[in-house]
């Protein structure tokens, strides 16, 4: 049964401006530990790809927060929601702390799709209650 659906479109130029204005602090606020390591590696190889990495994670977390119906309110925090890439290349969400407990108590699962182009990142998220 569908619990919630969320979508988000993120302007990559806004993320670029935030990173220029706030430096690493912006990424450290939005990204979980594993995401930070990936971002730093991508940024070192190709700075523009690092910016798009942050934009896709920002977009995915916004879409997820909408799908669970709470926005960015506890227990939903930027860093308690981590977007990973499975070996197949499929994006997935790993939850931490109180958000993980909240999610598991409701017997929910999440499906995520993420895409990006030069100026925009977009995400679509479906959360369903397990049978």
From Swiss-Prot:
Job description of the protein: Transfers the 4'-phosphopantetheine moiety from coenzyme A to a Ser of acyl-carrier-protein.
Family of the protein in this entry: Belongs to the P-Pant transferase superfamily. AcpS family.
Cystine pairs: none
GO cellular component, one term: cytoplasm
Organism: Delftia acidovorans (strain DSM 14801 / SPH-1)
Matching Pfam families: ACPS
Superkingdom of origin: Bacteria
Binding-site residues for Mg(2+), renumbered to this chain: 8, 62
One annotated GO biological process: fatty acid biosynthetic process
Keyword annotations of the record: Cytoplasm, Fatty acid biosynthesis, Fatty acid metabolism, Lipid biosynthesis, Lipid metabolism, Magnesium, Metal-binding, Transferase
Protein name: Holo-[acyl-carrier-protein] synthase
EC numbers, comma separated: 2.7.8.7
Stored InterPro entries: 4-PPantetheinyl_Trfase_dom, 4-PPantetheinyl_Trfase_dom_sf, ACPS, Ppantetheine-prot_Trfase_dom
CC cofactor: Mg(2+)
UniProt entry tagged with the keyword Membrane: no
Protein localization: Cytoplasm
């Amino acid at each position: 049964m569908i619990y919630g659906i969320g979508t988000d479109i993120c302007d990559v130029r806004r993320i670029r401006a935030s990173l220029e204005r706030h430096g690493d602090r912006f990424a450290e606020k939005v990204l979980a530990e594993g995401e930070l390591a990936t971002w730093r590696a991508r940024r070192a190889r190709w700075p523009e790809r690092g910016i798009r990495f942050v934009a896709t994670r920002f977009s995915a977390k916004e879409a997820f927060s909408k799908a669970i119906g709470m926005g960015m309110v506890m227990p939903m925090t930027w860093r308690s929601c981590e977007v990973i890439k499975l070996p197949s290349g499929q994006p997935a969400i790993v939850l931490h702390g109180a958000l993980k407990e909240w999610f598991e108590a409701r017997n929910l699962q999440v499906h995520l799709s993420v895409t990006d182009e030069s100026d925009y990142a977009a995400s679509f998220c479906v959360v369903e209650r397990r049978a």
